[in-house]
Regions:
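A Rossmann-like FAD-binding core segment of flavoenzymes
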Residues: 25-27, 69, 75-96, 103, ...
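Short hydrophobic core segments
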Residues: 6, 80, 103-113, 156, ...
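Glycine-rich dinucleotide-binding loop and its adjacent helix/turn
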Residues: 110-172, 207, 267-269, 491-495, ...
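Mid-to-C-terminal Rossmann-like scaffold of FAD/NAD(P)H-dependent oxidoreductases
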Residues: 1, 8, 284-397, 428-432, ...
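Rossmann-like dinucleotide-binding cores of NAD(P)H-dependent redox enzymes
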Residues: 59, 152, 160-218, 299-304, ...
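Rhodanese-like catalytic fold shared by cysteine-dependent sulfurtransferases
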Residues: 417-469, 477-510, 516-569
Length: 569
């Protein structure tokens, strides 16, 4: 059996290695148009910023290494330019001299990946305007930084690459402006979770502009000007375009393969395309979203590796199927970590999925042990069954392991009640007896059981100001002096004084309660409801509201963590 693989990196290289483990006699050829067959493309920004200092560390496997260990024929600098499925042949161009040759296959696997989106703007071809996708791109950017006095950089786009490059340019001592066309960075998060990232970025010295529509690039002195619609200009010595990626499917399109979402290659559960004996994996294919079942384009290394393994299994006659992706992702941004899995609100609404949500605020480990840091956890769930649909976390230590637990929970179809029962590793330096994952389950359980009604940050401004409802703040006097009230018409009664001051409240008016994070206001709601008051708890508390409704700065201090008692001041 002769298997030709077009493209290496995650999906193609994984498939090749799996094929060899399953079939020692197969002839396996990898065609890779770059000079690197298997490299850590997720690590490229960190070489630019100097975090990774040895570029050889980015190379996971060399052509020689593949040949020696796996007996695989790796042909770098060679590009597949034409695919003829009916003839089982592919035309290959040697990039060094432009010569071509035909290559026959029994099975073909496409792993062309994705290409950076270029918006085709005036001045975009200036050599100081870069994209980042390959090792060669990385070396060009690093060389430019080394050889030129780069003082100011503009990053266009606030996705994963844009944010990671902004961080690493700051690490390299470059004043960095990030221009994002939309109203938020990091689209896998909902806007209310991204708000904390906006505050944090600005606190790290990144000049962040949202709603910034770039119209072109033009020379300005010794550098460039990045021009916005409306005429505003940002000076730059270097520009990085990080506005997303698109499936690199031109070869597949010309060959007549069926394409789907965003032009990605349509495949079945065994990663087979519409052409006989042709498979496809990685960032170029559409997949089934595990929660909704809908076709999606999810360009991540984890799914690409799994798909490569499954395609290899099927080529070798093994029963294996890809059942879908959750889109689980994590981002390091200076000291901050942001992660998500499953559905966010935008996706749930688009798919017509019924959902409810809770926002909880927990410590990374036992708050009495030094170094505890906060994390904000937003969890979406099915209001009828309690099944977990999606989660987002923004915080510091321990975000990744909680997200992994929640991703596994969604995959297993767990409900909120089952989250409360998870027996997770605990010792004071590592976690809490009530882990942040357990806490999310407890809060959902309370909401579904009718123990508390909740409202969200965007409802605060819409609450009547005519005295027909009561806004009750149960924080300490010191907190209120420092942070202020949600609204000037709010009533302040500290939680520990509430039982003795119930007479100040009107049972004929609904009470909307808040504290700093949502825990003490929940306790207040339990007191009030059992004394005949109708009340609602502000999910996420003052802290979550303030990131979304004000221009507050980021506060990473472990203030009023869940479960920590507070005094009067």
């Amino acid at each position: 059996m002769k298997v030709v693989i077009i493209g290496g990196v995650a999906g193609g290289a994984t498939a090749a290695a799996r094929l060899r483990r399953l079939d020692e006699r197969a002839e396996i050829i990898i065609l890779e148009r770059t000079g690197y067959v298997s490299y850590a493309n997720c690590g490229l920004p960190y070489y630019v910023g100097g975090v990774i200092t040895d570029r050889e560390e980015l190379t996971l496997q060399t052509p020689e290494g593949f040949r020696n260990r796996f007996g695989i024929d790796v042909r770098v600098g060679q590009e597949a330019v034409e695919l003829r499925p009916e003839q089982h042949t592919v035309t290959v161009r040697r990039l060094e001299d432009g010569s071509t040759y035909a290559l026959h296959y029994d099975k073909l696997l496409l792993s062309p990946g994705a290409r950076p989106v270029r918006p085709n703007l005036p001045g975009e071809d200036d050599p100081r305007v870069f994209t980042l996708r390959t090792v060669e791109d990385t070396l060009r950017i690093r060389a430019y930084l080394d050889e030129h006095p780069v003082r100011r950089a503009v990053v266009v786009g606030g996705g994963f690459i844009g944010l990671e490059m902004a961080e690493n340019l700051v690490h390299a001592g470059v004043h960095t402006t990030l221009l994002q066309r939309g109203a938020q960075v990091l689209p896998p998060l909902d806007a209310d979770m991204a708000a904390e990232i906006h505050a944090y970025l600005r606190g790290q010295g990144v000049e962040l502009r949202l709603g910034a529509r770039v119209s072109g690039f033009s020379p300005q002195g010794d550098g460039l000007a990045v021009e916005l619609e409306g005429g505003e200009r940002f000076p730059a010595d270097l520009v990085l375009l990080g506005i997303g990626v698109a499936p690199d499917t031109e070869l597949a399109r010309r060959a007549g393969l069926a394409l789907g979402v965003k032009g990605a290659i349509s495949v079945d559960g065994q990663m087979r395309t519409s052409a006989p004996d042709v498979y496809a994996v990685g960032d170029a294919v559409e997949v089934r979203h595990f929660v909704t079942g809908a076709k999606s384009h999810i360009a991540l290394a984890g799914p690409a590796n799994k798909q490569g393994r499954i395609a290899a299994d099927h080529i070798c006659g093994r029963r294996s199927a890809y059942t879908g992706a959750l889109g689980t992702s994590v981002l390091k941004l200076f000291d901050l970590t942001a992660a998500s899995t499953g559905l966010n609100e935008k996706q749930a609404r688009a798919a017509g999925v019924a959902y409810d949500k809770v926002v909880t605020y927990s410590a990374s480990h036992a708050s009495y042990y030094p170094g505890a840091r906060n994390m904000t956890v937003k969890t979406l769930f099915d209001p009828a069954s309690g099944r977990i649909l999606g989660a987002q976390i923004v915080g510091f230590d321990g975000v990744d392991k909680r997200m992994d637990v929640l991703a596994a929970a969604i995959r297993a179809g767990l409900t909120a009640e089952q989250l409360t029962e998870l027996d997770l590793a605990y010792a004071p330096p590592y976690g809490s007896a009530k882990d942040p994952v357990n806490m999310a389950g407890y809060v959902i359980e309370n909401v579904r059981a009718g123990l508390v009604e909740q409202h969200h940050w965007d409802a605060v401004a819409e609450l009547p100001a005519d005295g027909s409802v009561i806004l009750l703040d149960v924080r300490t006097p010191g907190e209120v002096r420092k942070q202020g009230l949600l609204r000037s018409d709010a009533l302040h009664i500290p939680l520990d004084e509430l039982r003795g001051r119930l007479g100040e409240l009107d049972k004929g008016k609904k009470i909307y309660v808040n504290c700093y994070s949502g825990l003490r206001s929940y306790l207040a709601c339990r007191i009030l409801s059992q004394h005949g008051f109708q009340c609602s708890n502000l999910s996420g508390g003052w802290r979550f509201w303030s990131y979304n409704a004000t221009d507050r700065t980021h506060d990473a201090a472990p203030t009023h963590l869940c479960g920590v008692p507070t005094g009067k001041d």
